Structures are given as structure tokens and as C-alpha cells.
Swiss-Prot record:
Modified residues (Phosphoserine): 550
Any GO BP: proteolysis
Active site positions, chain numbering: 45 (charge relay system), 270 (charge relay system), 456 (charge relay system)
Peptidase S8 domain span: 19-514
UniProt entry tagged with the keyword Ribosomal protein: no
Gene Ontology CC terms: cytosol
Protein name according to UniProt: Tripeptidyl-peptidase 2 homolog
Length: 1218
């Protein structure tokens, strides 16, 4: 069309926040008063921003939010410290936890006069995208500020060089030049290592006699009297923002009698977008409203900002309790993870039994975004009984409004939408809803709205629609159950010709269904379905060759679900059921009489006559005694009949693809196959590169999807072959699922080849070696002729640690579960020393699953020697880098049963690190070649032929690297060529190290009586220690050991100087110098005099120690004895190694005493760099000195940065809260 044809066209706003597809729009037109009012929706997500557009008030003027809660703990602040306020005329003043002076308003009501203080670094809980934006601005600000300081320092240096163009010869001018150069170098270094810790907020908490009040110094000035004290959000729905730059909204909650304050801010934009789809209310532009603009919201943040908004089991557990406290009617969960075991786990039990079961909370959740292969639904949405799982659908109206396509395609589930069935046979997806929207996001994102798509968007679309139904039912005081709601939306959904008969939510139809229901009838109740064969628990699921080669009988125990207190109803329950099957290959009884305890129902499935591919049917149970004859429950039956591969290649020719078309093939991998090679070539002409989505999926018992499935997005270009390799398991049917990306509009014709490869170790799937065995034979077999160049390389090593301390204790009030049980915490602490900068992975010997887990949560943090938190993680093995230093790993494990935690009191921490130099193990043809050291040489292996070789397992000499310990476990893999797929894991247990201890002469074994007596000092109390020291001084007056011991004990300055002088008087300095000068020229072949070595080493160490004490003392005495200080300083530097940390300490003190602040700062920065993670260094004192030096230099910008950095590196609140 020409431009004039569009002049009168309006934007298709109906597709922006889709509501027609679900009948939500039509329902609101019919019943405008049932717009969600009276319904409270809980949103378990990244948190919802109360300042976002459309989320202020409901259609009736009520606050849109009833509550906002951070369930993760990321925003927790330790406010346990109480301080007294001083009267400063117009204000009250206190010292905040950060060290700032805070001004308080005298008008604040605080009857107890008790002020609790804490502080919080913003970047510990700000969303990741906001942190990045602010860090970019901070870097720009730093560059601007530092350029000015650097320009001033450079100008001053230039003036000096103009005055002294040649290198100055006198000491004073030379020191001035060095000072000016050091200032320039320090500014450059400060800029280079700049890692702004971000804003630091002081937090003040007090009780006004009715409620706790919280004030946050969000502008970091100390003038907190300018801020309004906030109450818990649920008290008055009060919130604020940190500033005009970040625009991040926050509310507060106070716990544990004021000792913990929770700052509630979002951890991402996701949850706000979800809230907009559910219930945004835009009075001036109602077409942008969410599905239920009249509902109220409770934001429950389960996405932990410390983990880039990943949900945690602990947060989920807390959220379930908050759902009960806040009287939530329906919840949306647009979160999920893979689960190896469906419908089982502590979080699942809370959702299924405590919320949906006992309290009729309607649960709506996303199905997952791991399609289009089958059995890709995630937990909790797609795998949990009584949860409404929502798939994502896209319609032509959405395509027009949201995706800017050149033309639309057929309405379709999104390509990436997860599909059922679940591993235990349930259909997985309950209904479909629109899976995309353009709606509200938090102001901090600097956007008013944003396009997002996913089942994360389809779930709130359905949740909002169902909220309309609940609004109508509650307004009419009509009872309902969560089970009845789920059945209504499923059985009235619009037919989409889906593979599992899953339809589109139809709000109006579902409401009519419920309006005509008698909620005392059988269908209002849940029915549990438990099968007795293999994976077929909640339905029949046949997929592997042995399951489909003959008919099978399945017994399902089906029972109505009754809660505690419903014993009477259970005893009187009886229903007459008529059963029907939807496919002729499924058989079930025609009638069943069922009591409250349930009944066994046999189901026979005969897949023998079915063609290869997917087949689906159901056993439907109807209430035969009810006129409506509605379906009471159903047993799904899924058969995926695989095809056998006649050889090692599966080929498809001239396969046509177009948008929305999905092609599936179920294949039985050849025995021995370990990976497939997929080759794709376009045989049709293409205007541009197209996209082919390929999923290679297998269902492996108790295995998460991401460990059994691979998704590939392959670019397809004309006349080019694209190849991908995918690892597989030969024991399970493989689904090869191929789809053109739904929005890739150009059709294409492809040739596809799937080649199976595999060389397997005959006895097992991994190789475990013990180094002390010396050798081990390995037998291999292949499914086809392959290159055979085996190579075993060990690249990593694993060190295991047991806790040094473990405490089990109950948590606080917010960790009481919905059933009244208290959560208990196991806190295990591990000490780890890192010798050099290292990248490592940490994991603990517990299940690494989110939803299918027997614990209510696990979390760990890593702290350095100054109690700075340097890393945190959860159930997933995480990689992190640690600098040289001493660290504590703290591991939190949660359960309602302390006896369960007791079993894990000594849980093992495993740290995996890379070897500096990989170890390649020698291979030999046989044990004779092993003896002759004749290496293995082989080029090929033929199909069906077993090929053997011998591995040499001995590790010694250079291979036994210094970083390895005797209990280290080496890990690596066996490869058979250049291919990275089809490898075999290898582990090797190290032998004891060969002792390199030298023989000692008899004279060296004689005990040093003096040293023994000196050592006794450390075991004596004060008075006895003083008495014993006097005895030693009188008995061994000329003993260096005694004088050194005295130096450790005495504190008074003059006495320390006197002792240092006594030490120096006992040492022949010239003889000491000659000895060490000569030692540098002594060859290794000359025998060593060990006794003399020890004697001279003692003198050298004592000499250095005495000089250190003298220099430390002189540095505190200003300009007193300046020349003596300089002489001792120079002498000490001559004796210290450059790598000795005391060099920078001594330099720092000396330059500081000479008012050479640039040189002092340079030394201090080096000291922090080399020893900042050492527990032996007082980092807090060094940072305090750094701030002092920066003030003296006039570099106030850097002083403010270091002020915050000090709180981060040496937290005043000890270890961070979990």
C-alpha cells in the first residue's frame, strides 16, 4: 500500500496487552463490576515496583499493593546495634553504623529513646541492570574527577622539572621529585583499579509506640531528618525512591524486634511486567489495562538479587508463609527450573498441599520455555499436581502489535514453549494464554513499558483472567475450590488442535461452567492418581522400545483428596463413575464405584499397531449420578513410538519447513552411540539466512532436562552445510524435534543427516584410577569404523574440606511455615587458604536441585580474612576467582526437621581448581609395553571389535605439582580424537608424596634448652609469664631467643627500643653481612653446614626484627631523631627481600613521617594489593591511613570512595546476613 492508505489506520492496541484471546475483554464488557475487585493476587517473582505506571490504585481507588515483601534476604540489614542520641540544638545526632554523623528530627516520636542503626551497600541488592547503568555513570564521574587531579599533579611536576631540568643531586630535591612522581603514579593506579562499591546507605530504626519506623540516608549526607520515616509496607503502603538518578522504589519491613530491617526493592524488571499483565490500571488509557485492573497485589520477591534474580528454595518457603499471612486468593509464578523428579520436593509440598490443598489458593504458573520438544515442562508449573500450568501462544493480533513482522503467520504456540508430558505421565500444560505483552516496567529501567515474551507472560495473562472469575464468585459469595477452578479452565478451553488437547483459556466459558456448578459435587474435589509401573505415575507414558513392543497393563490408585478435619466427609463420600477412552488402543473399565479411600483402576494400552511417532489419548471419568455428567478426573496416556536405525545414519531428504511447522522423529540410538552429528543443508533458494530450531531430547530417570537434552538454533544459508555435534545416551529413545522459528517467514527445503557415533568403554561409563596401582587396562568398542587415538588428560583437581564448626539452630518468625513448623538452619564453616590467585568451583555434598529437593533451601557465602563477602552461591555449582589469602566458606542448609540436618553436620565442601599444567597419562598396548615404556600407537577401531590399551597411573616428580595435596582427586577425560563429544570422565586418586626430608646429623637433634624455656612463656599466665621472663633474662642474658621473646611481650615504647638495641648489640653485623655475601657465591656441590645456617638465620631474623621495631617506633615520634630513623630505615631495606611485605609497611611509615604523602600512599597501595586478604594484616587500619593520606593530599573525591570501600572490605557488622 502507498502511505495514504495508512493515514487513517489506528495502532492495533488490542494486541499490546492481549485480552480478546482469553475472553477477558468480553467478560469485562459483560460484567464490569467483576474486574478483579475483591481478589488479592500474589506475585512470586523479582518483586514488583510500586512506582511503575498503572500500579498505583485499583479501579475502585484502593491502593494497588497490599504488601511488598523481600523473601530472599538480599535486602536484609543488621540493625541490632543500639546507640544513644546527643542533642545538637536543632537536631538529635547519632553515629551511624557506617561511621557517618546522622542528624535526626526532634519531631520523630520515639518514646524509648532507643535508636537502632545499620548500613547497607546498594550494590548488594540493586538489580544487575541498574548496577551496570550506575557503574557506567560512576566511571565517567571518576574519569572526570581524576583527570582534574591528575592535571594538577602533572602541572606541579612540570613546574618542578622546569626548575630542575636535570636530575637533582641533593637529597631534598630528589625526594621532592620522587614525591611528585608518586602522586601521578598513585592517581593512575587508583583509576586503573577503580571498582566503585556504589552507594552506602545508613539505616536508622526506632519504634514510635505503635509501629517500627525506618529512615534510610538515601542521599548519603547524614541529613536524614529530611526523610520521612517509613512503616512496614503493609501498615500504610508507604514507599520511596533512593534518588532521582537510580529511580529505584523501595519499601521496608522490620523483623526480630528491630534487629533486622528488610529493604524491599525489586531485583529485576520481570515481576513488574508480570504485574502489569495481571492487573495494571490505566484510567486514561484502559486499553492498556491488565486483565484484572480491579485486583490488589502482594509482591513476594523470590528472585534473589545476589544471584542475578535466580529464585531460591528458602525464598519460596517464606513466600508460601506470606501468602497465608496476606490472605492471598490466587498466585502467579512466572519462574521455574528443571526438575528430575516431578511433583515431589519440599517447595512442591508447600504449594500443592498447604496452599492449593488445604487453603484453596489458586496457583497459576509458567510451563517453561524449553520447547518445542516433548517432556520439557519445568517445575513447579508443569510438574506439580493442582497447579495450573500455562503455555505460551501467539496470535495474529499480537504479531501486528508487538513484533513488527512483514506479514503474519498462523496463530501458534511459540516455538520455544515447553510441551508435556511430564516424566510421570501428566499432560504438563493445562491451558494456553497469550505469551507476549508490552506493559509496565520499573522506572529505574528508564522505560515506561517494554515488550517481553515467554510463558512468564502467558501465566499472568491466565492469572489475570482467572482473577476475573474469582472476583465474580467472591462477589456472589459462591464457594469454590482450587481444584474446581483448574477443571473449569481446562474443560472449557478453546480447542487449538494441540497434541495433548490443551486449549486456550476462555474466561467467560469457565465462569459459566462454575456458575452452573454445585460446589458440593464430586468434581469440585481433587483426585490423586498414582500408577504402579515405571514412570507412569499420574498417567501412562510409554517411550522406550521395551515399553511399546507389546501391550501393557497399568493399575492406577485413584482417590479423592481430603484434608485434615474432613474425616466425616471422607467416610460419607461415594461416587458412581462411568469411564470412557478417547482412543481404541486404550482400554479401561466401563464403570467404577469409588469410596473416600479411592479405588484401583486398571488401564490397558496396546501400542503394537501404532505407527512410529506421537500418540495421545485419555481415560475420562464422569460422574454418572450427576445430570451434568461432567468429567471428574482423567488419566492421560502418551505413546511415543520410536523407529529403529538400520545402520548408524538417519537421513531426511527434501524436508519442507515453514513458520509454526514442527517435525518430530523418535529414534532408538544404536547400542554404543555416544553422540550424533547433525548436518543440515538448504536445497531451496533463500533470500536471507533462516533459523532452524533443533532439540535432541531424551528422558532419563531422575535427570534434569538440561542434563538430558540439547537445544540448537542453527543458521541455514543457501549452499552451505551446517554441522552440530550432540552428546546422547544409547539407553533411551531420542526425540529429534525440528522447527522453523515461528517468526522466520521464508519457507525452506532441507536435507538433514543424523549420523550416530560412539566409542565406549566396555565396563562402565567412567574410568576410576588409583595412582598407586601403577597401571589399568581399558577395553573399548565402537559402533562404526572410527579414528582411534585415545588420550587421557587430567585438567582439574578437587580438594575436599570438612567443616571446622557447625551450628544447628531455629530461624526467626518469618521462617515459620504455613503448617506451623519452624525452619531450622545448619550453618557449617570451612577454612580455606589460597596460595595464589585461583579460579575454582564450589559444591557441597547435597542434592543440587531447586524444586525436587528434600531441603527447604541451601545457600553459601565466601568471606575473606576481613569478613568481606567476596562470593555467594546456591544449589548450582558456581565458578569464582579468589585472590591469595585466607577465606571462610559458610554453608546454610535449611529444613523443618533438625534431625535431618544433624545427618549433614559434617557435609563435605569440594573445591575444583584447574591444574597449572594438565597431566597426560601414558598409554601402552599391553602390560609388557608398559614395562618397556613403549607408548601406544593406534589409528583406527572397527565396528564391533574390542580394542584394549593400558593406562600408566603413577604420578610423581614434576607431575605431582606443588598445588596438589595427598587427598586431592584429579579429574579429566578420555578422548578418542579431536572430537569434544563422546568423551569418558576420568578420575585419579593420588598416591602419598615422596618424602624429600633430608637426613639430619645427630648433633642437630639435640634439644635447644633455651628455646624450650622460651616456648614455655606462651603457656603461662601474666604474672607467671613476667616471673619466668625475669628468670630467663638473668640466666641467659646474651640469648637472642630470650631477647626476642621479651620483644614480643613488652609494650612500653622505651622498653621496646631498649630491647631492640640489646638485640643489635648481640649481633656481629659485619660477620653477618660477610656470611650472606659469601652464601650467594657458594655452589650447590659444596656440603652445607646446617648448624651454622640455623645460627646465622636466627641472627639475621633477630637483626631485622630489631630494626623493624626501631623504625616503627621512630615513625610515631615525628621529626625526633630524624637522622637515626633514616639510617635504620636504609639499613633495614638493605636486609629485607623485595617480596617481604614489611618493605611496604616500613616505606609507608617512613614517608608518612616525612610528610611525603604521595610516596606513603604508593607504598600503602602496594601493601594492600599484596596482603589485603591476609588475616595477619590490619586492613581496617590501613584503609583508615589511606583516607588520612588522601585528605592530606587534598584528593577528597578518592577519600569518599575509600570511605565506602572501607565498609565493604571491613564490614562493621561482621559477617553478612544470609
Amino acid at each position: 500500500m502507498i502511505p495514504s492508505d495508512y493515514s487513517n489506520k489506528f495502532y492495533p492496541v488490542d494486541g499490546v496487552v492481549p485480552k480478546h484471546e482469553t475472553q477477558a475483554y468480553e467478560f469485562l464488557k459483560k460484567f464490569p463490576e467483576y474486574d478483579g475487585r475483591g481478589v488479592t493476587v500474589g506475585i512470586l517473582d523479582t518483586g514488583v515496583d510500586p512506582g511503575a505506571p498503572g500500579l498505583s490504585v485499583t479501579t475502585t481507588g484502593l491502593p494497588k499493593f497490599k504488601n511488598i515483601v523481600d523473601c530472599t534476604g538480599a535486602g536484609d540489614v543488621d540493625t541490632s546495634v543500639e546507640v544513644a542520641a546527643a542533642d545538637s540544638n536543632d537536631y538529635l545526632t547519632i553515629t551511624g553504623r557506617s561511621g557517618r554523623t546522622l542528624k535526626l528530627s526532634k519531631e520523630w516520636k520515639n518514646p524509648s529513646k532507643k535508636w537502632k542503626v545499620g548500613c547497607k551497600l546498594a550494590y548488594e541488592f540493586f538489580p544487575k541492570d541498574l548496577r551496570k547503568r550506575l557503574q557506567k555513570l560512576e566511571t565517567e564521574d571518576m574519569n572526570k574527577s581524576n583527570r582534574k587531579l591528575l592535571q594538577d599533579a602533572t602541572d606541579e611536576y612540570a613546574k618542578f622539572k622546569d626548575k630542575f631540568p636535570e636530575a637533582p643531586l641533593d637529597k631534598d630535591n630528589l625526594q621532592t621529585q620522587k614525591e611528585l612522581e608518586a602522586r601521578i603514579e598513585c592517581l593512575k593506579q587508583l583509576a586503573e583499579k577503580f571498582d566503585n562499591p556504589g552507594p552506602l546507605y545508613d539505616v536508622v530504626v526506632f519504634h514510635d509506640g505503635e509501629h517500627w519506623r525506618v529512615v534510610i540516608d538515601s542521599d548519603q549526607t547524614g541529613d536524614i531528618y529530611l526523610h520521612k520515616p517509613l512503616a512496614d509496607f503493609n501498615v500504610a503502603q508507604e514507599w520511596s525512591t533512593f534518588g532521582s538518578l537510580d529511580l529505584l522504589s523501595y519499601g521496608v519491613h522490620v523483623y526480630d524486634n528491630g534487629n533486622i530491617t528488610s529493604i524491599v526493592a525489586v531485583s529485576g524488571t520481570h515481576g513488574t511486567h508480570v504485574a502489569g499483565i495481571i492487573g495494571a490500571n490505566h484510567p486514561e488509557t484502559p486499553e492498556l489495562n491488565g486483565a484484572a485492573p480491579g485486583c490488589q497485589l502482594v509482591s513476594l520477591m523470590i528472585g534473589d538479587g545476589r544471584l542475578d534474580s535466580l529464585e531460591t528454595s528458602h525464598a519460596f518457603s517464606r513466600a508460601c508463609s506470606e501468602i497465608i499471612k496476606n490472605e492471598v486468593d490466587i498466585i502467579n509464578i512466572s519462574f521455574g527450573e528443571d526438575a528430575g523428579i516431578p511433583n515431589k520436593g519440599r517447595v512442591i509440598e508447600l504449594l500443592r498441599d498447604e496452599l492449593a490443598g488445604k487453603r484453596n489458593v489458586v496457583i497459576v504458573s509458567s510451563a517453561g520455555n524449553n520447547g518445542p520438544a516433548y517432556t520439557t515442562v519445568g517445575a513447579p508449573g508443569g510438574t506439580t499436581f493442582d497447579v495450573i500450568s500455562v503455555g505460551a501462544y501467539v496470535t495474529s493480533g499480537m504479531m501486528q502489535a508487538q513484533y513488527n513482522l512483514l506479514s503474519t503467520v498462523h496463530d501458534t504456540p511459540y516455538t520455544w514453549c515447553s510441551r508435556g508430558p511430564t516424566l510421570d505421565g501428566d499432560t504438563g500444560v493445562s491451558i494456553y494464554a497469550p505469551g507476549g505483552a508490552i506493559t509496565s516496567v520499573p522506572p529505574y529501567s528508564l522505560q515506561n513499558s517494554q515488550l517481553m515474551n515467554g510463558t512468564s507472560m502467558s501465566s499472568p495473562s491466565a492469572c489475570g483472567g482467572i482473577s476475573l472469575i474469582l472476583s465474580a464468585l467472591k462477589a456472589q459469595k459462591k464457594p469454590y475450590t482450587a481444584a474446581a477452578i483448574k477443571k473449569a479452565v481446562m474443560y472449557t478451553s478453546k480447542d487449538l488442535r494441540d497434541d495433548f488437547n490443551t486449549g486456550m483459556l476462555q474466561v467467560d466459558n469457565a465462569y459459566e461452567y462454575l456458575a452452573q456448578s454445585d460446589f458440593q459435587y464430586t468434581g469440585a474435589r481433587s483426585f490423586t492418581i498414582n500408577g504402579n509401573i515405571g514412570n507412569s505415575k499420574r498417567g501412562v507414558y510409554l517411550r522406550n522400545p521395551t515399553e511399546v513392543c507389546s501391550p501393557s497393563r497399568h493399575m492406577f490408585n485413584v482417590a479423592p483428596k481430603f484434608e485434615d478435619g474432613e474425616e466425616y466427609e471422607k467416610s460419607h463420600f461415594e461416587v458412581q463413575l462411568s469411564l470412557a477412552t478417547t482412543q481404541p488402543w486404550i482400554q479401561a473399565p466401563e464403570y467404577v464405584m469409588m469410596a473416600g479411600t479411592g479405588r484401583g483402576i486398571p488401564v490397558r494400552v496396546d501400542p503394537t499397531a501404532l505407527a512410529p511417532g506421537h500418540h495421545f489419548g485419555k481415560v475420562l471419568a464422569y460422574d454418572a449420578s450427576n445430570e451434568s455428567r461432567r468429567c471428574v478426573f482423567e488419566i492421560p496416556v502418551t505413546v511415543m513410538k520410536p523407529s529403529s536405525i538400520s545402520n548408524t545414519c538417519f537421513s531426511l531428504r527434501d524436508v519442507s519447513f515453514e513458520p509454526t511447522l514442527i517435525k518430530r522423529h523418535f529414534l532408538v540410538p544404536p547400542k554404543g552411540a555416544t553422540y550424533v552429528e547433525i548436518r543440515v543443508k538448504a536445497t531451496s533458494e533463500l533470500e536471507s539466512t533462516n533459523m532452524l530450531w533443533i532439540s535432541v531430547n531424551q528422558t532419563i530417570p531422575q535427570t534434569k532436562l538440561n542434563e538430558a537434552s540439547t537445544e540448537l538454533i542453527m543458521p541455514v544459508t543457501q549452499n552451505e552445510v551446517t554441522t552440530k555435534l550432540v552428546s546422547i545416551d544409547d539407553s533411551y529413545t531420542l526425540e529429534l524435534c525440528m522447527a522453523q522459528w515461528w517468526s522466520s517467514l521464508e519457507p525452506m527445503v532441507l536435507d538433514i543427516d543424523v549420523n550416530f557415533h560412539g566409542i565406549k568403554v566396555v565396563n562402565g561409563k567412567e574410568i576410576n584410577l588409583i595412582s598407586s596401582q601403577g597401571l589399568k587396562r581399558v577395553d573399548c568398542a565402537s559402533i562404526r569404523r572410527e579414528n582411534f587415538k585415545p588420550d587421557i588428560t587430567l585438567k582439574d583437581y578437587v580438594d575436599s574440606f570438612k567443616p571446622t564448626n557447625t551450628v544447628i539452630k531455629p530461624l526467626g518468625d518469618r521462617d515459620i511455615m504455613p503448617d506451623g513448623q519452624q525452619l531450622f538452619e545448619l550453618m557449617a564453616t570451612y577454612s580455606v587458604e589460597i596460595s595464589e590467585k585461583t579460579e575454582l568451583k564450589a559444591d557441597f555434598a547435597v542434592p543440587h536441585n531447586m524444586y525436587d529437593n528434600g531441603f527447604n533451601g541451601l545457600f553459601f557465602m565466601v568471606f575473606d580474612s576481613q569478613k568481606q563477602r567476596v562470593h555467594y552461591g546456591d544449589m548450582y555449582t558456581s565458578s569464582h576467582t579468589l585472590e591469595k589469602g585466607e577465606y571462610l566458606y559458610k554453608f546454610q542448609l535449611l529444613s523443618v526437621d533438625p534431625s535431618t540436618l544433624e545427618r549433614f553436620r559434617n557435609v563435605t565442601l569440594r573445591l575444583t581448581k584447574k591444574l597449572k599444567k594438565p597431566i597426560t597419562l601414558p598409554l601402552y598396548a599391553d602390560h609388557i609395553d608398559f614395562c618397556d615404556n613403549k607408548t601406544y600407537e593406534r589409528e583406527n577401531i572397527d565396528a564391533g571389535v574390542v580394542e584394549s590399551f593400558v593406562v600408566g597411573t603413577n604420578i610423581e616428580g614434576e607431575q605431582y605439582a606443588s598445588e596438589l595435596k595427598e587427598n586431592s582427586l584429579l579429574t579429566g577425560e578420555l578422548k578418542f580424537g579431536d572430537c569434544e563429544k563422546g568423551t569418558v570422565p576420568v578420575t585419579l586418586v593420588l598416591p602419598p608424596k615422596i618424602s624429600t626430608k633430608e637426613d639430619t646429623k645427630l648433633g642437630e637433634k639435640c634439644a635447644n634448652i633455651v628455646q624450650l624455656q622460651v616456648d614455655l612463656l606462651s603457656k603461662l599466665a601474666d604474672q607467671e609469664k613476667e616471673k619466668h621472663l625475669k628468670y630467663l633474662q638473668s640466666s641467659y642474658k646474651n640469648s637472642l631467643e630470650v631477647q626476642l621473646a621479651k620483644l614480643d611481650i613488652v609494650k612500653e615504647t622505651n622498653e621496646r627500643l631498649s630491647t631492640a638495641d640489646s638485640i643489635l648489640s648481640l649481633i656481629d653485623t659485619e660477620a653477618l653481612s660477610r656470611y650472606y655475601s659469601c652464601q650467594q657465591k657458594v655452589e650447590d656441590t659444596i656440603p652445607r653446614d646446617v648448624v651454622l645456617e640455623k645460627k646465622m638465620a636466627l641472627q639475621r631474623d633477630a637483626f631485622i626484627r630489631a630494626l623493624v621495631v626501631k623504625c616503627e617506633t621512630f615513625s610515631t615520634q615525628g621529626h625526633k631523631d630524624k637522622d637515626n630513623y633514616f639510617q635504620n630505615y636504609q639499613l633495614l631495606l638493605n636486609w629485607l627481600e623485595n617480596s617481604d611485605p614489611r618493605v611496604w609497611q616500613i616505606k609507608k611509615d617512613y614517608y608518612k613521617s616525612q610528610n611525603q604523602y604521595g610516596l606513603a600512599l604508593k607504598a600503602l597501595l602496594e601493601l594492600l594489593k599484596e596482603n589485603g586478604n591476609s588475616g595477619k594484616m590490619d586492613v581496617a587500619k590501613l584503609l583508615s591511613e589511606e583516607k588520612e593520606l588522601l585528605v592530606n593530599l587534598g584528593w577528597n573525591y578518592w577519600h569518599d570512595i575509600v570511605f565506602v570501600e572501607t565498609v565493604k572490605r571491613v564490614p562493621p557488622y561482621s559477617y553478612a546476613l544470609f
